[in-house]
Amino acid sequence: MLIIRNKQALKEAILKETQVNKTIGFVPTMGFLHEGHMTLVKHARKENDVVVMSVFVNPTQFGPNEDFDAYPRDEAHDAKLAEEGGVDILFVPSVEEIYPVELATKLHVIKRVSVLDGADREGHFDGVVTVLTKLFHLVNPNNAYFGQKDAQQVAVVSGLVEDYFFPVNLRIISTVRETDGLAKSSRNVYLTDKERKEAPVIHAALQLGRQLIESGETDETKIVQMMTDKINEQTAHEKIAYLALYAYPDFTPVTDWSKGIIIAAAVKYSKARLIDNELINVKRR
């Protein structure tokens, strides 16, 4: 496995592969890898000749009240997992490598971000599309891999790819979970033992919402209240940041219950904010 920190070296390494018609699969991450990331790598390995992974904690997607410096990092651990998983090129740039000068232009997301994380974390998705635009240009992948757990991000990135004609196929992979249903996340390490035992109720509540909708329930207030009650009864969280359902991928109010719907939750614990979702009537790519 090649570990590359320099943009030019990355482009040269990838050009060497594409000149002999090899396909490139790309897994962008912020590091502190876990089984969820490695599932993306597994799919990329199966579907491409060359697998490129980036590990970059992107400062532009952190808000003023979010601690960029405290985000967990472990490069040695990440490199070990990446190599064991079959990554060919690991791109680990510095902030200065990706943002060498102050940006003269800025991407701004105007749709699919007025609710959920888009509303809760102002400017977050602007940072996401900015760094992905840079990375897509550097890697020029045939396929890029994202997890369903970040469903709003997936919808935003799909819009980016469609709007700016990026020649990349987005591959969306189902959320990887612990045996008790908790979605795998780098932030799970911040949960106390008690919080960790209780946190799987988030997924259980979302499944309840799915069951209600699939059984014909269309009273949105009732669905959300039943899910809220389930979470409040079974876990001592700090607050529910959001628990809602929307049409997917547009994140507008549901008007047709036979089309794509997302039920999404964000629950704040003492030192961790966990997100999860269920997609209904959505065909995965």
From Swiss-Prot:
<comment type="similarity">
    <text>Belongs to the pantothenate synthetase family.</text>
</comment>
<feature type="binding site">
    <location>
        <begin position="30"/>
        <end position="37"/>
    </location>
    <ligand>
        <name>ATP</name>
    </ligand>
</feature>
<feature type="binding site">
    <location>
        <position position="153"/>
    </location>
    <ligand>
        <name>(R)-pantoate</name>
    </ligand>
</feature>
<dbReference type="InterPro" id="IPR014729">
    <property type="entry name" value="Rossmann-like_a/b/a_fold"/>
</dbReference>
<dbReference type="InterPro" id="IPR042176">
    <property type="entry name" value="Pantoate_ligase_C"/>
</dbReference>
<feature type="binding site">
    <location>
        <position position="61"/>
    </location>
    <ligand>
        <name>beta-alanine</name>
    </ligand>
</feature>
<comment type="function">
    <text>Catalyzes the condensation of pantoate with beta-alanine in an ATP-dependent reaction via a pantoyl-adenylate intermediate.</text>
</comment>
<comment type="pathway">
    <text>Cofactor biosynthesis; (R)-pantothenate biosynthesis; (R)-pantothenate from (R)-pantoate and beta-alanine: step 1/1.</text>
</comment>
<dbReference type="InterPro" id="IPR003721">
    <property type="entry name" value="Pantoate_ligase"/>
</dbReference>
<keyword id="KW-0436">Ligase</keyword>
<dbReference type="InterPro" id="IPR004821">
    <property type="entry name" value="Cyt_trans-like"/>
</dbReference>
<dbReference type="GO" id="GO:0015940">
    <property type="term" value="P:pantothenate biosynthetic process"/>
</dbReference>
<keyword id="KW-0547">Nucleotide-binding</keyword>
<feature type="binding site">
    <location>
        <begin position="184"/>
        <end position="187"/>
    </location>
    <ligand>
        <name>ATP</name>
    </ligand>
</feature>
<dbReference type="GO" id="GO:0005829">
    <property type="term" value="C:cytosol"/>
</dbReference>
<keyword id="KW-0566">Pantothenate biosynthesis</keyword>
<feature type="active site" description="Proton donor">
    <location>
        <position position="37"/>
    </location>
</feature>
<dbReference type="Pfam" id="PF02569">
    <property type="entry name" value="Pantoate_ligase"/>
</dbReference>
<keyword id="KW-0067">ATP-binding</keyword>
<feature type="binding site">
    <location>
        <position position="61"/>
    </location>
    <ligand>
        <name>(R)-pantoate</name>
    </ligand>
</feature>
<dbReference type="GO" id="GO:0004592">
    <property type="term" value="F:pantoate-beta-alanine ligase activity"/>
</dbReference>
<feature type="binding site">
    <location>
        <begin position="147"/>
        <end position="150"/>
    </location>
    <ligand>
        <name>ATP</name>
    </ligand>
</feature>
<dbReference type="GO" id="GO:0005524">
    <property type="term" value="F:ATP binding"/>
</dbReference>
<keyword id="KW-0963">Cytoplasm</keyword>
<comment type="subunit">
    <text>Homodimer.</text>
</comment>
<protein>
    <recommendedName>
        <fullName>Pantothenate synthetase</fullName>
        <ecNumber>6.3.2.1</ecNumber>
    </recommendedName>
</protein>
<feature type="binding site">
    <location>
        <position position="176"/>
    </location>
    <ligand>
        <name>ATP</name>
    </ligand>
</feature>
